[in-house]
């Protein structure tokens, strides 16, 4: 087993190994700048959306003025009728009402078009982000997944991107419309009375100060909310995957306690952020209503002195009421942008994660791989400050079977992971056929090597599809031959649908031993020149082990093979046995040679039979 260093954070069923909440957004402006770079490819659609918003608002702001004209016409007509000088011109009023209806209909149409276009931009941006994240995850080293929980990574892919898309769509649409509305209303208000406009504008500085204070306070809570959501998702995901283990070890109480802690973190950050965001609307409305009262008093005074018409009062009151609304909407949009920035920051952190070392410019082309493997002074540590493989050197001839044995944590699995270049070396080199493995592309290197891990991983899909994963171009006959070599063909035929049997998620509809046999068959099908069997028989019973051991013996003929096994009886016929302890080679030789030395290997071997 690998002695991979675990980070200091708790992991496993009772610990998540994730970052805590409460962290303030590091760079709001920088994050938003990066975000808007993703809008550039859709800038034409974005600009058309803004234009639609401008047109919609420009048409809409005329409405209250026309309503005021209708009221003025009615008031003047009524006064004329009282004075005996005529009456109300209903034909003119009907035409004005029809014009008003047409104006509002056009404004609604442009507003809908603007919302549709903005929604398209934000969703395309979300699509692009998910695409880049999916490409990024294939470029990340395994060390990234050692340090970050699956739940947190999943939360970045789903919750954070969804939050980003939805909040950005709503905030952008609302903010563009609100800014244009403020300008339009201000122009119309000034056209009626600069004095009343000045009275109405008194409330703006108060509202802006309030918005800035609340936004500053709420920003860190929105970031904490997103991160706490990642904690909760990660814990639930792990509990679902390991629910049997949790129950077996009576860990329900600790699991519930951990969930309660994470849920409390989410609750605390969520209610604080929502409390602050909820304050903005009522407080800005209160300030707006105070200004509204002042406008009404001043408007009445100006009407009495003949400076404005009666209908202008109604128009201005409508503008005043509507003028405070976009200010409130902008404050809410700023609030949503905090949520956008918090989610975007986590997404960009993922996209900015350090990738695997770049591929070599002119890679070695492998044609006739012999399978000669050389480890030369290899040093490695999952944490650079804690070396787990110490100056490891070994030469393996083509076609040799090399067993790597040792107690748990000795570094056995680490060695083969380094051969596969899952991790980069701290020092030293590994060669295949005389070429440093860094001279090959990673895909080319891994095409040379077939690997069967202790954890038998199969995908949701048919057995045939899972076996073909080792060689997508394989024919049905080749798949069947590989299954026969792994002694799993008989089992497959006992299933109702044979090779077309669909494995469910986590392949729980077959046993662990059967899953292991299928992964071995998958490696057979790949027909690699170098074979790695990492505890390949550890999950099968003795009878099944005997069957697949025969198949593996046939498979390993003519191939360079690395076998990692706890059951030392399975590697007695290996050409070389490397005995490791704490990252060091303590003994090398054949089974008989090592037994004669009566050293560390002999103690391991005898200990197993004493246990048996």
Task: Give residue ranges: language-model regions.
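Juxtamembrane loop-to-helix connectors within ABC transporter transmembrane domains
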Residues: 21, 31, 39, 118, ...
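An intracellular "coupling" helix at the cytosolic face of ABC transporter transmembrane type-1 domains
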Residues: 41, 142-143, 161-168, 172, ...
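Hydrophobic alpha-helical segments in the permease module
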Residues: 100-107, 111, 204-212, 277-291, ...
């Amino acid at each position: 087993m690998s002695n991979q260093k675990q980070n200091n954070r708790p992991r496993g069923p009772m610990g998540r190994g994730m970052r805590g909440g409460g962290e303030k957004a590091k760079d709001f402006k920088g994050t938003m700048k990066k975000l808007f770079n993703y809008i550039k490819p859709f800038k034409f659609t974005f600009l058309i959306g803004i234009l639609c918003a401008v047109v919609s608002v420009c048409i809409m702001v005329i409405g209250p003025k026309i309503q005021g004209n209708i009221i003025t016409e009615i008031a003047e007509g009524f006064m004329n009728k009282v004075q005996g000088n005529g009456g109300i011109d209903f034909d003119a009023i009907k035409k004005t009402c029809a014009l008003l209806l047409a104006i509002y209909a056009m404004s609604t149409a442009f507003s809908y078009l603007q919302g549709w276009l903005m929604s398209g931009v934000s969703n395309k941006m979300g699509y692009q982000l998910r695409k880049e994240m999916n490409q990024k995850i294939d470029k990340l080293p395994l060390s990234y997944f050692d340090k970050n929980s699956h739940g947190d990574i999943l939360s970045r892919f789903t919750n954070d991107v969804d939050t980003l898309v939805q909040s950005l769509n709503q905030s952008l649409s609302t903010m563009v419309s609100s800014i244009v509305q403020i300008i339009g209303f201000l122009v119309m208000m000034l056209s009626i009375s600069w004095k009343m406009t000045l009275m109405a504008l008194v409330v703006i500085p108060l509202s802006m100060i309030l918005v800035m204070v609340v936004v500053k306070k709420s920003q860190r809570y929105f970031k904490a909310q997103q991160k706490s959501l990642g904690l909760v998702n990660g814990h639930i995901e792990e509990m679902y995957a390991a629910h049997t283990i949790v129950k077996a070890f009576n860990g329900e109480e600790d699991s519930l306690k951990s969930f309660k802690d994470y849920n409390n973190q989410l609750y605390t950050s969520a209610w604080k952020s929502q409390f602050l965001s909820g304050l903005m609307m009522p407080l800005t409305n209160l300030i707006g209503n105070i200004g509204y009262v002042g406008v009404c008093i001043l408007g009445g005074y100006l009407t009495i002195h003949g400076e404005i018409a009666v209908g202008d009062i109604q128009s201005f009151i409508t503008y005043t009421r509507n003028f405070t609304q976009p200010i409130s909407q902008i404050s809410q949009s700023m609030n949503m942008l905090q949520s956008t920035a918090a989610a975007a920051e986590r997404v960009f952190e993922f996209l900015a994660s350090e990738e695997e070392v770049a591929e070599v410019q002119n890679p070695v082309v492998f044609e006739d791989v012999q399978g000669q493997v050389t480890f030369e002074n290899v040093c490695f540590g999952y944490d650079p400050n804690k070396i787990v493989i110490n100056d490891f050197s070994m030469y393996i001839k083509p076609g040799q079977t090399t067993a790597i044995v040792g107690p748990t944590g000795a570094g056995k699995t680490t060695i083969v992971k380094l051969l596969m270049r899952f991790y980069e070396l701290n020092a030293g080199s590994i060669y295949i056929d005389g070429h440093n493995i860094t001279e090959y592309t990673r895909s080319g290197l891994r095409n040379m090597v077939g690997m069967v891990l202790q954890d038998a991983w199969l995908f949701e899909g048919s057995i045939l599809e899972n076996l073909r994963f080792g060689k997508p171009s394989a024919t049905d006959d080749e798949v069947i031959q590989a299954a026969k070599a792994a002694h799993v063909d008989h089992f497959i035929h006992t299933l109702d649908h044979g090779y077309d049997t669909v494995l469910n998620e986590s392949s729980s509809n077959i046993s662990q031993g059967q899953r292991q046999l299928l992964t071995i068959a998958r490696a057979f099908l790949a027909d690699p020149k170098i074979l790695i069997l990492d505890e390949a028989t550890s999950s099968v019973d003795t009878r099944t082990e005997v069957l697949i051991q025969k198949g593996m013996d046939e498979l390993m003929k003519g191939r360079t093979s690395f076998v990692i096994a706890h059951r030392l009886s399975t590697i007695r016929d290996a050409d070389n046995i490397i005995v490791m302890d704490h990252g060091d080679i303590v003994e090398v030789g054949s089974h008989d040679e090592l037994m004669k030395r009566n050293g560390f290997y002999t103690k391991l071997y005898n200990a197993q039979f004493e246990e048996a």
